[in-house]
UniProtKB/Swiss-Prot annotation:
Family: Belongs to the NAD-dependent glycerol-3-phosphate dehydrogenase family.
MF terms in GO: glycerol-3-phosphate dehydrogenase [NAD(P)+] activity; NAD binding
Keyword line: Cytoplasm, Lipid biosynthesis, Lipid metabolism, NAD, NADP, Nucleotide-binding, Oxidoreductase, Phospholipid biosynthesis, Phospholipid metabolism
Binding site for NADPH: 13, 33, 81, 113, 227, 253
Biological function: Catalyzes the reduction of the glycolytic intermediate dihydroxyacetone phosphate (DHAP) to sn-glycerol 3-phosphate (G3P), the key precursor for phospholipid synthesis.
Catalytic activity as recorded in UniProt: sn-glycerol 3-phosphate + NAD(+) = dihydroxyacetone phosphate + NADH + H(+); sn-glycerol 3-phosphate + NADP(+) = dihydroxyacetone phosphate + NADPH + H(+)
Residue positions binding sn-glycerol 3-phosphate: 81, 109, 163, 216, 226-228
Classification via Gene3D superfamilies: N-(1-d-carboxylethyl)-l-norvaline Dehydrogenase, domain 2 (1.10.1040.10), NAD(P)-binding Rossmann-like Domain (3.40.50.720)
Gene from which this protein is expressed: gpsA
SUPFAM superfamilies listed in its UniProt record: 6-phosphogluconate dehydrogenase C-terminal domain-like, NAD(P)-binding Rossmann-fold domains
Provenance organism: Thermosynechococcus vestitus (strain NIES-2133 / IAM M-273 / BP-1)
Entry protein name: Glycerol-3-phosphate dehydrogenase [NAD(P)+]
Active-site feature positions: 163
Amino acid sequence: MSPRVLILGLGHWGQTLAYLFEQRGCTVSSWGRSQGALSAALFQDIHLLVSALPIKAVREVAAQVTRLHPPLGIILVSATKGLESETFATAADIWQTYCPHHDLVVLSGPNLASEIQQGLPAAAVVGGNLAATKQVQDCLGSPTFRLYSNEDRRGVEMGGIFKNVIAIACGVNDGLGLGVNARSALITRGLVEMVRVGTHWGGQVETFYGLSGLGDLLATCTSALSRNYQVGWHLAQGKSLSQALALTKGTAEGVNTARVLCTYAQQHQLDIPITAMVNAVLCGSLTPQAALHCLLERPFKPEVIPGQ
């Protein structure tokens, strides 16, 4: 019998994951919030439960899932890249709270959905215990979608979360016509901020230099296909945040993530200047040009590479 997969979330990424599982011969069912409440029948005989929901919907849906008592053999796969505003919780944190006895893995990497749907090659990381990640690799991995495993679930998840903010910065850079040199500096120094916060959150340094960290950062910060990049680009063109979001198809998680990360960094005295400037632009307290000026006026300092 082919593996049965239930995907929660009917957005672009959820649809792309459904396509990938179907390509591997899995039997796939999909559910979206517009379809009403979940039912126990959806969980019958499934092997993988994949969450591709926006972060703001995860807690509500996870609460529904746990009330239906899904069988313990189901592996939960979190494919959400965001932080909950009130709690600093990641999507995996939320699923762990509501389904503590299920195996839980995180799927993340440089995966622009539209390229994958065209059949173009890509790679990603499954973070979690190796027995569970192996099952996901077997169900989802293919010659055009290469899956690696990593036991550092926290690091895999944090890389995918943080890169969205830096992608907004790079969209602003390109929208202002500031060139490749400046964008390269933003990506590199953004990686430093990712490692600084991600390791404080419990991730391992090495993970952030892999596919789910640096890899995702490069893809998202250099492609107009990225929703977060698009938001930054529209802001640089003089659009308001509401206008930028209206022009961007789908959820740009980096908008909320920037604010949450700034609050977290302030509480824990972590220096994340690029993220802070992105948040200031999103809040409307600085123009993109003024934010850039603030970054360039920072005192000179030694280049510190986390992990060295």
